[in-house]
């Protein structure tokens, strides 16, 4: 590869990274605004806002942006924040089920963009309920390994608070619980002196589909296209990626 083409490739990749960083910031800000609108600006009584702010800070969103988002969402700046949460259902390659969660101020725009991204990237839209039945809402909390020596240490801290299970995912321990137990589990971690990276309510698949490398690449292409949409907040799929396939995907990212 010539020096010029290598620089052009590097510059292109940086532009993509910068664009996705900006989109990530915008989505985090939107979460803060909605949390503040629903529960108010006082974080002592709004755990959803606490989580939204914490996630934004860990992603390096500037504090001024966070403060403005809290005030704007709570109506303290005279602006009206009016977002709707809409869920779209579809299938990626090889029948992998997909839920696309949008937070939008324009339902028609969101629907059109999701449909277009689906059709252009190998996906198909599904009827309401035909995919969602396979997903359950769960509280999902990620604890980095350097915060707790073992899985048993994490489980001991959160079991009485309502945690259902703890799974070791290599770099993090993942705690699952009912959404209504999220606050109690977070507090139990804090009381045990254990910090966490993220705490979110997610749609967790009950049944997963193991995928090969070709299918995984196709699914990732569709997920990337969806993540580029401004109205899309979260994407959930039921693909199960074996370790060797994940290693190959990681190699793809480094090229």
Swiss-Prot record:
HAMAP family: Transcrip_reg_TACO1 (MF_00693). One of its GO terms (molecular function) is DNA binding. It comes from Clavibacter michiganensis subsp. michiganensis (strain NCPPB 382). Belongs to the TACO1 family. It is found in: Cytoplasm. The keyword Cytoplasm applies. One of its GO terms (cellular component) is cytosol. One of its GO terms (biological process) is regulation of DNA-templated transcription. SUPFAM superfamilies: YebC-like. Pfam families: TACO1_YebC_N, Transcrip_reg. NCBIfam families: PRK00110.1, PRK12378.1, YebC/PmpR family DNA-binding transcriptional regulator. This is Probable transcriptional regulatory protein CMM_1817. Keywords: Cytoplasm, DNA-binding, Transcription, Transcription regulation. Its main location: cytoplasm. Transmembrane segments: none annotated. The keyword Transcription applies.
């Amino acid at each position: 590869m010539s020096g010029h083409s290598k620089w052009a490739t590097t510059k292109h990749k940086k532009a993509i990274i910068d664009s996705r960083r900006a989109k990530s910031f915008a989505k985090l800000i939107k979460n803060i605004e909605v949390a503040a609108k629903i529960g108010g600006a006082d974080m002592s009584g709004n755990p959803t806002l606490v989580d939204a702010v914490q996630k934004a800070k860990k992603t390096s969103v500037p504090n001024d942006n966070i403060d403005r988002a809290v005030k704007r969402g709570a109506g303290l700046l005279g602006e009206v924040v009016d977002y709707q949460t809409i869920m779209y259902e579809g299938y990626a390659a090889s029948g992998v089920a997909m839920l696309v969660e949008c937070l939008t101020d324009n339902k028609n725009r969101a629907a059109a963009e999701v449909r277009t991204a689906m059709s252009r990237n190998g996906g198909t839209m599904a009827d309401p309920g035909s995919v969602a039945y396979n997903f359950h809402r769960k509280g999902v909390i990620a604890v980095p390994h350097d915060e707790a020596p073992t899985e048993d240490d994490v489980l001991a801290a959160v079991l009485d608070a309502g945690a259902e299970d703890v799974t070791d995912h290599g770099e993090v321990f993942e705690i699952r619980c009912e959404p209504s137990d999220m606050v109690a589990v977070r507090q139990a971690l804090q009381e045990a002196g254990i910090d966490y990276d993220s705490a979110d309510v997610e749609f967790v698949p009950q049944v997963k589909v193991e995928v090969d490398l070709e299918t995984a690449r196709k699914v990732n292409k569709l997920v990337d296209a969806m993540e580029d949409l401004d109205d899309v907040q979260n994407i959930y799929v039921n693909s199960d990626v074996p370790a060797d396939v994940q290693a190959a995907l990681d190699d793809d990212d480094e090229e």
